[in-house]
């Protein structure tokens, strides 16, 4: 009996105990509890998400140089829909997006135009701060070798005219309008003949002929804003007359325009004037002149551009349609201006 009892006790260790419903097996004496509970710590001032957002923003800007036009378009759309509230970030956005004015894809250029409009509406005056680089790319687009890029160039110019002042670039933009429309600034008979027959020029393709309507509309807008907008003196007189100050007080205040005395050339080398016997401005002197005041712009228009523009616009008036109407509007503006 004693032997059988010992055998049963030894076999207990190798038998699986049958547990009742709801009962758990008894834990051995040498059991060690290895379970643990995790707790999260929230720090309101932690910058983990901010760093991640900055990295994501930088990555998006880098995708603007992606080889796929679809990717570039989607990135521009995403940036347009999620513009930051911090104005400091707009410098990076404009610097990265403005080169896409020369993008080969028309869809990308359209989205860049929408981006510039959104920036202008959300941050007034911001496009005016970056107008120098934007104008450079617009001028490059106006003289680009691809017709599609030339056709959309004036649309960017119209957007910039809405939110910025382009008086300093009056001459450059007009000269590139002549190139865009295949007009000539020369006086010889050969150039006049070419300037009249604009339909036979190499730069005008089928799509470009349709785009001339947009070009002329923007030209009308450009001329009105730079030649007919004489509100500077009127606003000053109106404001100061309301508060009953001396009429000449505004002359002794800080100028409202940047580099107001640039025309005096106080810090530059004196350049000999190339005026003709009648006192008109020479073409060679255009690049050295500042055009912030309306008198200078009117003199430049009357001496250099007016007669040649009217000559070429009359050729467009003969075509009729919308092109003829816009050309006729330009002629009315040019014939109505006078030196003040």
Swiss-Prot record:
Lineage: Eukaryota, Fungi, Dikarya, Ascomycota, Saccharomycotina
Similarity remark: Belongs to the IPI1/TEX10 family.
Keywords associated with the record: Nucleus, Ribosome biogenesis, rRNA processing
Xref: Gene3D superfamilies: Leucine-rich Repeat Variant
One Gene Ontology MF term: chromatin binding
Complexes and interactors: Component of the RIX1 complex, composed of IPI1, RIX1/IPI2 and IPI3 in a 1:2:2 stoichiometry. The complex interacts (via RIX1) with MDN1 (via its hexameric AAA ATPase ring) and the pre-60S ribosome particles.
GO biological process, one term: maturation of LSU-rRNA from tricistronic rRNA transcript (SSU-rRNA, 5.8S rRNA, LSU-rRNA)
Annotated protein name in UniProt: Pre-rRNA-processing protein IPI1
Source domain of life: Eukaryota
Subcellular location as annotated: Nucleus
A Pfam match: Ipi1_N
The keyword rRNA processing belongs to this UniProt entry's keyword annotation: yes
GO cellular component: cytosol; nucleoplasm; rixosome complex
Role description: Component of the RIX1 complex required for processing of ITS2 sequences from 35S pre-rRNA.
Region (Disordered): 1-20
Coiled-coil ranges per UniProt: none
Naturally occurring in which organism (per UniProt): Lodderomyces elongisporus (strain ATCC 11503 / CBS 2605 / JCM 1781 / NBRC 1676 / NRRL YB-4239) (Yeast)
């Amino acid at each position: 009996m004693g032997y059988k009892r010992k055998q049963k006790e030894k076999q207990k260790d190798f038998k699986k105990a049958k547990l009742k419903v709801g009962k758990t097996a008894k834990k051995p004496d040498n059991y060690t509890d290895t379970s643990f509970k995790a707790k999260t710590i929230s720090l309101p001032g932690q910058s983990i998400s901010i760093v991640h957002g900055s990295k994501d923003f930088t990555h998006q800007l880098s995708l603007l140089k992606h080889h796929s036009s679809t990717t570039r378009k989607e990135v521009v759309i995403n940036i347009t829909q999620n513009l930051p509230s911090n104005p400091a970030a707009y410098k990076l956005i404009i610097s990265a997006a403005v080169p896409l004015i020369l993008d080969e894809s028309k869809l990308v250029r359209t989205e860049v135009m929408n981006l510039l409009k959104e920036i202008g509406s959300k941050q007034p005056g911001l496009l005016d701060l970056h107008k120098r680089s934007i104008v450079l790319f617009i001028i490059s687009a106006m003289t680009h070798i691809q017709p599609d890029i030339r056709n959309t160039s004036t649309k960017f110019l119209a957007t910039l005219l809405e939110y910025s002042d382009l008086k300093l670039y009056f001459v450059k933009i007009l000269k590139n309008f002549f190139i865009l429309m295949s007009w000539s600034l020369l006086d010889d008979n050969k150039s006049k003949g070419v300037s009249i027959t604009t339909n036979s020029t190499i730069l005008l393709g089928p799509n470009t002929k349709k785009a001339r309507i947009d070009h002329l509309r923007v030209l009308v807008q450009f001329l009105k804003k730079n030649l007919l907008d004489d509100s500077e003196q009127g606003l000053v007189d109106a404001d100061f007359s309301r508060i009953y100050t001396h009429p000449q007080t505004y002359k002794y205040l800080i100028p409202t325009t940047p580099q107001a005395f640039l025309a005096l050339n106080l810090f530059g080398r004196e350049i000999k004037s190339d005026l003709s016997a009648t006192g008109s401005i020479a073409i060679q002197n255009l690049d050295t002149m500042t055009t912030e005041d309306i008198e200078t712009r009117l003199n430049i228009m009357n001496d250099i551009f007016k007669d040649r523009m009217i000559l070429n616009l009359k050729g467009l008036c003969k075509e009729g349609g919308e092109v003829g109407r816009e050309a006729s509007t330009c002629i009315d503006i040019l014939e109505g201006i006078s030196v003040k």
